[in-house]
Curated annotation (Swiss-Prot):
Catalytic activity: GTP + H2O = 7,8-dihydroneopterin 3'-triphosphate + formate + H(+)
Pathway: Cofactor biosynthesis; 7,8-dihydroneopterin triphosphate biosynthesis; 7,8-dihydroneopterin triphosphate from GTP: step 1/1
Top EC class of this enzyme: hydrolase
Name of the protein this chain belongs to: GTP cyclohydrolase 1
Keywords of the record: GTP-binding, Hydrolase, Metal-binding, Nucleotide-binding, One-carbon metabolism, Zinc
Molecular function in Gene Ontology: GTP binding; GTP cyclohydrolase I activity; zinc ion binding
Origin superkingdom: Bacteria
One GO BP annotation of this record: one-carbon metabolic process
Binding positions for Zn(2+) per the UniProt entry: C88, H91, C160
PANTHER family the record matches: GTP CYCLOHYDROLASE 1 (PTHR11109:SF7), GTP CYCLOHYDROLASE I (PTHR11109)
PROSITE patterns for this protein: GTP_CYCLOHYDROL_1_1
Amino acid sequence: MPKKIDTKKIEECIREIIVALGDDPNREGLLDTPKRVSKMYEEVFQGMTLSNREIAEAFGTTFENEDYDSETHNNMVVVKDIPIHSYCEHHLALMYNMKVTVVYIPKDKIIGLSKISRIADMVGRRLQLQERIGTDIAEIVSMVTKSSDVGVLITGEHGCMTSRGIKKPGTLTTTTTFTGKFQTNDLLRQEALLIMK
């Protein structure tokens, strides 16, 4: 059962943050800010209300993959450059300009291509690490397709690096997650990486 985001509590906390920053939450420009931020958080953190299993169930439409022998074939399905955004769990800073590429080797079931994009989007709607986004996407795609052979490549910019601290805009972070044959077969992993980039 999905968890519920406590929007009232978020409103109260945002109001307190405004006061702590030295501003007046009752002035015209800020009067509705706690409510607006609360609604925004409910939207951008929607993925926090669902477990990986619940996301798999929500976006798990598959098609039978008849007449396909996965033991003798390593044919890959690749969905490239899915745009997502997320928020860093360390600073609550935006992770943006993110592109997710997912590859898997079909077994008995094939997932609808749009569902892979929906899975990536929903996983991004959490307080996250980029590495965990890849791990969660791979786990969910594996749950849905029953394939243990999944790869995820993610690139993105992190607000905690581009707008604070070291302040290096344009710096990209790249992470990879590989499971099954992609993890154990170097040639297959290299082939997948060539296709994914």
